[in-house]
């Protein structure tokens, strides 16, 4: 047992003893629930922070505050609530028995304080502790003030402690809530209807990914946590709801990285009588408006860069982007779509770039890998990448002028994908053929290929109007708005391996 653990165990034992000493003197409960707060810290600061000491004395304003003790310096306590911090003073006018009990208070305890509001000589508001009540005794100590909670893994495993002691973490999740609310309000103003579709699917679909598998006991059948809501949302468009959106969780049984968590949040939406160009325009409007609403500017810092959401955003085909970011590669500079269709050419090109290829990869998959390795990470400013091959876009409508590619885009900021959208494939026969090609790919070893969904084909046979749809990764978007570089910093409880 380390010295640090021994010290912590000693503190826990001391705090338990303090709680045990309190219990016999409590007529009802050592964890009372009768205290009522009248003001939060920020409310008092906003309303009375500009008053002079004399004005507050004359006002004689009495208040009740509640929160967690974050510091204890002689007769002064620093109390933190959801809105901020305020001090309490346990000296002037405090009853003798309360002073005695004051000595038993520890940093981390949750208390309620009632008394008159004053201004200290340093200009800080404080509440004189005429009355106080211990509401919850903290049995474990908080991390030391100057060392803090710096271990990243502990921050993720014990997010509750992280939120108590790290203002930056609290503000990141406040911003996350604001981003989601702003997106929801924007979509509702654009006459989209918010819906909820199943989280457990009989057939996983809507994206190329490995699903999580579970078992439905009552039906005695396997089911899958959804990898995307797409096929259900498009069924709703078939049913006549012309504009729908959903903000919810998706689950993909894949690896962990600074950009990936198996459980993540998406906003997915569909609009009838629109195409992928309309989606790009709407995305520009959405992101620029929420940036200005939440940050007061369309520009925001991200690492060493300044990201400009003001628009218009760059629009490049995947082939154009590869050529732009490989200016010294003569083969790439001369490459045409006819060559992209040549499997051997694409394999040789990928290998020459140091890419480890899979034998079942198609021309489109090879093009996407080349893009990902050489161009994607350089897309710092908002950029739409178009021209995705049909063989990696099984749900997207083919381009009218070039049937090898689809009317699809992915949206990149800060060197990572944030959104994916396209004009929807509403040709039931073409969709049937592409599902069958996905089944063949799965049989060849691609475990991320899609399943065949016969009911979705039936839905398309009833008629899906011309439609465009898009998914936006909420977690990655929040990373931008909070200037953080790992997805775990914007997910309250990220996936972690259990501790031994």
From Swiss-Prot:
Q: Which UniProt keywords apply?
A: Aminoacyl-tRNA synthetase, ATP-binding, Cytoplasm, Ligase, Magnesium, Metal-binding, Nucleotide-binding, Protein biosynthesis
State a single Pfam family of this protein: tRNA-synt_2
The catalytic activity, as recorded, is: tRNA(Lys) + L-lysine + ATP = L-lysyl-tRNA(Lys) + AMP + diphosphate
Asked whether the UniProt record includes RNA-binding among its keywords, one would answer no
Query: Could you say which EC number(s) this protein's record lists?
Result: 6.1.1.6
Co-factor binding details: Binds 3 Mg(2+) ions per subunit.
List, in alphabetical order, the Gene Ontology terms for molecular function in this entry. Answer: ATP binding; lysine-tRNA ligase activity; magnesium ion binding; tRNA binding
Give the matching CDD domains: LysRS_core (cd00775), LysRS_N (cd04322)
Annotated residues that bind Mg(2+) 2 are located at 417
Q: Which cofactor does it need?
A: Mg(2+)
Q: Which InterPro entries match?
A: Aa-tRNA-synt_II, aa-tRNA-synth_II, aa-tRNA-synth_II/BPL/LPL, Lys-tRNA-ligase_II, Lys-tRNA-ligase_II_N, Lys-tRNA-synth_II_C, NA-bd_OB-fold, NA-bd_OB_tRNA
Q: What is its main location?
A: cytoplasm
Q: Where in the cell is it found?
A: Cytoplasm
Q: Which GO terms describe its biological process?
A: lysyl-tRNA aminoacylation
For Mg(2+) 1, which residues are the binding ones?
410, 417
GO CC terms of this entry: cytoplasm; cytosol
Q: Which SUPFAM superfamilies match?
A: Class II aaRS and biotin synthetases, Nucleic acid-binding proteins
Q: Which family is this protein grouped under?
A: Belongs to the class-II aminoacyl-tRNA synthetase family.
Q: How does it assemble?
A: Homodimer.
Q: What is this protein called?
A: Lysine--tRNA ligase
Natural source organism: Shewanella oneidensis (strain ATCC 700550 / JCM 31522 / CIP 106686 / LMG 19005 / NCIMB 14063 / MR-1)
Protein's gene: lysS
């Amino acid at each position: 047992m380390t010295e640090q653990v021994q010290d912590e165990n000693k503190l826990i034992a001391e705090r338990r003893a303090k709680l045990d000493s309190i219990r016999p003197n409590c007529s009802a409960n050592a964890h009372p629930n009768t205290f009522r707060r009248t003001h939060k810290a920020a409310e008092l600061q906003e309303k009375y922070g500009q008053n002079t000491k004399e004005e507050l004395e004359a006002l004689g304003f009495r208040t009740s505050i509640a929160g967690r003790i974050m510091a204890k310096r002689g007769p002064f306590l620093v109390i933190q609530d959801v809105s901020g911090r305020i001090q309490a003073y346990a000296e002037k006018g405090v009853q003798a028995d309360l002073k005695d009990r004051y000595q038993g208070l520890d940093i981390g305890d949750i208390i309620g304080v009632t008394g008159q509001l004053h201004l200290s000589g340093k200009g800080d508001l404080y509440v004189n502790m005429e009355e106080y009540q211990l509401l919850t005794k903290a049995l474990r100590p908080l991390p030391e003030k100057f060392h803090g909670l710096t271990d990243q893994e502990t921050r993720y495993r014990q997010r509750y402690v992280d939120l108590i002691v790290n203002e930056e973490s609290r503000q990141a999740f406040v911003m996350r809530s604001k981003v989601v609310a702003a997106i929801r309000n924007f979509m509702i103003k654009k006459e989209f209807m918010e819906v909820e579709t199943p989280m457990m699917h009989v057939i996983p679909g809507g994206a190329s990914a490995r699903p999580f598998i579970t078992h439905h006991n009552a039906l005695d059948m396997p089911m899958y946590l959804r990898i995307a809501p797409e096929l259900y949302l498009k069924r709703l468009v078939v049913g006549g709801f012309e504009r729908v959106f959903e903000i919810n969780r998706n689950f993909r049984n894949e690896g962990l990285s600074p950009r990936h968590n198996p459980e993540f949040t998406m906003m997915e939406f569909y609009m009838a009588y629109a195409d992928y160009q309309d989606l790009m325009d709407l995305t520009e409007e959405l992101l620029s408006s929420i940036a200005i609403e939440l940050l007061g500017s369309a520009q925001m810092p991200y690492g060493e860069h300044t990201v400009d959401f003001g628009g218009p955003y760059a629009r490049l085909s995947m082939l154009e982007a590869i050529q732009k970011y490989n200016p010294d590669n003569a083969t790439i500079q001369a490459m045409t779509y006819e060559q992209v269709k040549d499997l051997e050419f694409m394999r040789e090109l990928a290998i020459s770039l140091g890419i480890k290829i899979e034998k079942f990869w198609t021309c489109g998959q090879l093009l996407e890998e080349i893009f990902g390795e050489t161009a994607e990470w350089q897309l710092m400013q908002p950029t739409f990448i178009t021209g995705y091959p049909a063989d990696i876009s099984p749900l997207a409508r083919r381009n009218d002028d070039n049937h090898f590619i689809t009317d699809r885009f992915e949206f990149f900021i800060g060197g990572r994908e944030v959104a994916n959208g396209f004009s929807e494939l509403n040709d039931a026969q073409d969709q049937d053929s592409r599902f069958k090609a996905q089944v063949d790919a799965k049989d060849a070893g691609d475990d991320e290929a899609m399943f065949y969904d016969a009911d979705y084909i039936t839905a398309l046979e009833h008629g899906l109007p011309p439609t465009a749809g898009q998914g936006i990764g909420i977690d990655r978007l929040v990373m931008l708005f909070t200037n953080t570089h790992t997805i775990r910093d914007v997910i309250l409880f990220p996936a972690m391996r259990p501790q031994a």
